[in-house]
């Protein structure tokens, strides 16, 4: 039994990290293949939330990129994680560096709702302790509200690796055995080889279905915009992530992904003012370009007001690739 547990621990933490955190691990494995297939192209790692996961479809960029002889096109890869605000973005970047990836550009998603960290909006509460690696401990100590308790839980997880990860393992080995209401693989089961998570396959939109999604989301986000402010924890994590990317030699940009007319109407004037002032502060303090794609897409492509449909992701990415190239005209390929 001890040998079985020890073997499981090695697999979960080292040999097959996608077993512990398949959402990140599967993307990391896919990224290695894409880099091997496209040597010399400058790597652009895009990190963010489910909006990034479903919105950035690099295959669409591959179909239209210039592929000129005098300049290597950016190699876009989607390293988003569902629920990701600045802290999870920092976690993803730290993991990518620990796994040996050295992006030429890192694009961080900027989204005001995930810049709140107070009360129910505390981002670490969205991170399941079972998906944390030993290398995540510094992040836990810096940003979690009770790091000692989280570390204790991580140690317990490693003493009982099969039991504590049984649901996640089952979701990967036999997902159909899980009832739909308890499926865990929605964030990774459909990932393609470029890190894209296909969203709702709906365009043109079905008015009744789209209206129902908007009605479900509206009270949630109106609540997040009430008494809105950018939390110091989110600001610290975002600035640390930008600094880390630059320390490792990458250029950095921020991206504000598309929102529908309805979603923007849920944002109070005060929340809008504070978010725009904060974005301007980041642009000035950090000297970063901002790819403002907030108004790029017709409402019909946004199935719930803020997530792109599959068709919308393709249209968006065909425009996003050139925007990245324009933001970094000096970007060249590796020798």
Which residue ranges define each predicted feature?
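Membrane/wall-proximal cationic-aromatic binding patches
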Residues: 4-75, 91-95
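Histidine-centered active-site loop/cap adjacent to the catalytic His
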Residues: 304-335
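Membrane-embedded segments
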Residues: 47, 51-143
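Loop/turn elements at helix/coil->beta-strand transitions in domains of secreted/extracellular proteins
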Residues: 41-43, 72-74, 101-105, 248-253, ...
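Soluble non-cytosolic domains of exported or imported proteins
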Residues: 51, 55, 83-87, 101, ...
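Secreted/periplasmic serine-hydrolase-like ester/acetyl group-modifying domain
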Residues: 123-248
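Solvent-exposed, polar/charged alpha-helical surfaces in well-ordered, non-transmembrane soluble domains
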Residues: 59, 63, 91-94, 236-243, ...
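Extended hydrophobic/aromatic segments used for targeting, binding, or gating
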Residues: 230-306
């Amino acid at each position: 039994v001890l040998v079985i547990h020890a073997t499981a621990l090695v697999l979960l933490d080292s040999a097959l990290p996608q077993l512990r955190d398949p959402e990140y691990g599967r993307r990391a494995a896919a990224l290695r293949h894409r880099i091997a297939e496209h040597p010399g192209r400058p790597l652009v790692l895009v990190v963010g939330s489910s909006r990034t996961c479903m919105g950035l479809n690099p295959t669409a960029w591959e179909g239209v990129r210039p592929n000129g002889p005098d300049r290597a096109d950016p190699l876009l890869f989607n390293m988003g994680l569902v629920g990701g605000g600045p802290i999870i973005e920092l976690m993803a970047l730290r993991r990518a560096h620990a796994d040996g990836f050295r992006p030429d550009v890192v694009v961080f998603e900027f989204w005001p709702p995930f810049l709140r960290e107070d009360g129910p909006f505390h981002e670490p509460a969205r991170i399941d302790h079972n998906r944390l690696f030993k290398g995540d401990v510094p992040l836990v100590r810096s940003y979690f509200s009770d790091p000692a308790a989280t570390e204790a839980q991580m140690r317990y997880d490693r003493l009982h690796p099969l039991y504590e990860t049984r649901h996640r393992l089952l979701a990967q080995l036999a997902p159909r055995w899980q009832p739909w209401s308890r499926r865990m693989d929605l964030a990774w089961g459909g990932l393609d080889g470029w890190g894209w998570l296909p969203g709702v396959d709906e365009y043109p939109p079905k008015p009744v279905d789209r209206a129902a999604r908007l009605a479900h989301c509206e009270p949630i986000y109106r609540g997040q915009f009430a008494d809105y402010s950018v939390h110091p924890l989110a600001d610290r994590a975002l600035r640390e992530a930008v600094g880390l990317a630059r320390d490792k030699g990458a250029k950095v940009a921020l991206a504000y992904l598309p929102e529908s007319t309805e979603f923007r109407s849920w944002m109070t004037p005060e929340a809008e003012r504070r978010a725009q002032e904060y974005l301007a502060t980041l642009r000035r303090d950090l000297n970063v370009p901002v790819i403002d794609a907030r108004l790029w897409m017709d409402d019909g492509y946004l199935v719930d007001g803020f997530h792109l449909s599959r068709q919308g992701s393709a249209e968006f990415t065909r425009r996003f690739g050139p925007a990245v190239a324009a933001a970094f005209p000096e970007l060249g390929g590796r020798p």
